Amino acid sequence: MTTATTKKGWADRLADGMEVMAPIFDQPHLASIRDGFVAMMPLLIIGALVLLILQFPCSLAEGSNCYLGDIMDQDLAAKLWVPFSATYGLLSVFVTISVSYALAKRRGLDPVMPVIFTFLAFMLVAAPRLTGYDAEADQFLDNTGLFTAIVVAVISIEVFRFFVKRNLVITMPAGVPPAIANAFIALIPGFVIVFGWWIIRFLLNFDLAGGLFVVLSKIVPVASTYTAVAIAETIHAFLWTMGIHGDLTIGIALQPIWTANLAANAQAVANGLAPTAIYTSEFRSYVVPGGSGATLPLAFYFIRSKAPRLRRVGWLGIWPGIFNINEPITFGAPVVFNPVLAIPFILITFINATVAYLAHVLHLVTPTFIAAPWTLPSPLLMFMMTGFDWRAAVLAVITEFVIPGIIWWPAFKAWEKQVLEKEKVEVPAAAAPARA
């Protein structure tokens, strides 16, 4: 009697890895923060379109600082800045709404009233000047209030849920329309949320937004140092080799920092200053071009492989890889639980992060300040996200093809040899007649 064993496909391996990390990915607060920031991408891209237009170079001469916004009608240019100010200038407001909405949905709440009260609470905490009470108070409505937005959103929604879950609300008879019933249900928790934050900000005079800004102004630069970048990206690559979604894992912790850095760069450019923050989610396109591990050269090698199985994997992975999606390679080669491919996968990520960071430190490329769809081919993507800096496209070619191409080649040959030897054993065994 024989027992058939079925090999798991790359999709099954991905599902297994995701199952291991499910408790982290599905933790309501972390998942809501992640989903809230991801939902901001359309707003960031729309605001970035203004920068793309106004920062379009009008001269290709070396050292020229002439941009389209400088030579067009200045009244029109001023009006074009309005969409930028309405997106990046109110970024923390939108994050408050987005995170609170995501958390309210995860907590099983009708999100309309919880989100409204959370928005009001954030405005009390982050923009007291708008109330007319303190005309000198700082406002934290742009990227400077991102972490305040997270804190206010999470606490406010949990307070709302506390009252609803324990039925500490005003309930209406069964025949009352749902919209009216929900309005009365929201009354008590909404009162507690609004006046709770009012007490903290105005009676106790505790400036949460200002305090968080001071603290995080120390933390964010540390989290953006080379050491932090190298550690985070190496961990990200290692997790992928274990079948765990590395991008989601580190993104849960670092997405707010990436977004804050990108928004700070965009604001700097809008104010006529040079962008300085290096570690953004857009910077990571230098680190993981073609997908984590920069596997696009490996896909090309697979296509020319002597092993039929690797050729199939190569053709499956080459087209998604051009658009920075490489799960067919990661789980089809496989890289997962395969030291022959896992070691270069991690090494390439580390080297790419090092080379890209060093290029920024030496001022060889412009830091990213424009949000763009990450599925664009990496050289084009980096050219756009740096405000048409051709050097960024060159660096992207180096980190996508040159460095990975050199490192993947010996690993590919070693793995191809193992696959061919295995196929030589399996083919005769399959062709052998069964014994009577």
Listing of model-derived features with the role each one plays in the protein:
Residues 46, 92, 96, 100, ...:
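Alpha-helical transmembrane segments in multi-pass membrane proteins
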Residues 22, 26-166, 336:
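Early transmembrane hairpin of solute transport permeases
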Residues 25, 93-103, 120, 271-339, ...:
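Alpha-helical membrane segments and immediately flanking helix-loop junctions
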Residues 111, 127-227, 239:
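Membrane-interface helix-loop-helix junctions at boundaries between adjacent transmembrane segments
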Residues 14-37, 76-77, 173-181, 328-330:
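Cytosolic juxtamembrane amphipathic/interface segments immediately preceding
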Residues 2-24, 266-274, 299, 316, ...:
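Transmembrane alpha-helical segments and their short flanking loops
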Residues 191-308, 314:
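Generic multipass alpha-helical transmembrane bundles of integral membrane proteins
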Residues 45-73, 204-226, 245-258, 362-371:
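Interfacial/capping segments of alpha-helical transmembrane domains
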